[in-house]
Every structure is written in structure tokens, then in C-alpha cells.
């Protein structure tokens, strides 16, 4: 049975063999999920030949570790193949926006839920795409996300444990990251510091900072500057052997 809130958007048929899959985590400040960062993004990934799974993870009034539990359960479900799609279990990634980017980054840095069946290396993605992420809860953090996820006055040790840039290791998966320099909701330093930590650990990272653009652009169609992110990301996924051209099939299949 599929985990709560998980829906699949299959890549078009036409290629033999298993394909990569990506878990999509929409943003919304851990208070809601933004629809424009959910199924439309999954459909874009599917057009690249990647199976996509959208997770409507738990949000406030549920607190940590509920969203992380949901995300890890979804990752394990995607890898184990119970969904019936031909997924390559060695190529399962994550894509997150804003607070969903925080959830994606904490998956990548193996943040703990305290549940041994979920705190499994198989729940760590093989790559990540982070879109204007809330990467830090300690430095220029998005306070709304902090309050919705952790409540009032969370302990500093927990804030540190859930700040992705402080928990990067050489085993953290590669990342494609983008942000806008004038994001007034989630400062660009979140992306800069996470990318810096990845590079310092020897982890491949591609970072794009666009001079202008409001927070929450999603696919950013028609937006000068940020509207390039999907083509840049598709090229990155192609170089990694995960994607074909739009409406095509995944490379290597």
C-alpha cells in the first residue's frame, strides 16, 4: 500500500528497463503544500523520462518528525517497487521547494526520526534538486517554517540537527540548487551556505542564483532569469544519465 499522501506520475512508455524516479516535495512553510510546486513539476519530470512521485507530507499542527517520517517512508516505498512502476532502485532522487527543499535537504543529510525502520540508508536520495530551499534553521532561517515544524522555542541541538548545511558529509548526494538573490521570504544565503558545504565536502553541486524573482516561483514559466532553471536542471539530469530530452526517455534506457 502506498504511503499516505503519495501519488505517482509515470513517465511515458516507450523505453525498456527501469528508469530513475524523483520524489517531489512542494513548499508551503510546513503549513500547507503549494499546488503549483506539486503535480505540474511531476509532469515536467515525467516528460524527461523520469518517474515522479508527489508527496503531500504532514504539516502543522503536526510537528517534527512527522514530515521527515513521511518523506523517508515515501523514499523506501519508491525504492522497493511496490508501486508497480519500473523504477531503478539505484537512481531515486528528491526535488523540493522552499520548506519542501528543507525536507529534501534533511533527507540528503540523513537527519534522524528516531525510528530505526525509517532511519535507513536507503531513505537517503541519490541526488537532489533544491529550489529556493529553507536549508538552515540556524542562520537567516525562515521563522514561519521553524515555528510550524518545531513549535515555540525549539532546543538549539534540534535546530542544528535539522540545518542541512551543518550536517553535510562526503556521503551527501550531489545537488542542483537555484535561488533568487532578492528572495524576501527565504534568504539566498540558505542556498549559498548549503552549496558551500557540499563543495567543501567534495560533493558535486551546481548552483544558480538569479538576480531577481519573488519567492515561490515553481516552474517559473515566463519569468526572465528564473525561467531558465528547468532547462538548466534538465541538462544537469541528462549529464548525470537520469534524463532524456523532454517527452523523450531517460538516458541509458
Where are these regions (language model features)?
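Mobile cap/lid helix-loop segments that gate and shape the active-site cleft of serine hydrolases
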Residues: 133-167, 173
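C-terminal catalytic histidine-bearing segment of alpha/beta-hydrolase fold enzymes
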Residues: 188, 192-253
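Catalytic nucleophile-loop/oxyanion-hole region of alpha/beta-hydrolase
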Residues: 33-36, 40, 53-91, 220-228
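Primarily recognizes the serine-hydrolase "nucleophile elbow" in alpha/beta-hydrolase
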Residues: 73-143, 159-160
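A fold-wide structural signal in alpha/beta-hydrolase
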Residues: 21, 46-53, 93, 206
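N-terminal cap/lid segment of alpha/beta-hydrolase-fold proteins
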Residues: 1-17, 143
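Short beta-strand/loop motif that positions the catalytic acidic residue
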Residues: 177-179, 183
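Short beta-strand element of the alpha/beta-hydrolase
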Residues: 18-27
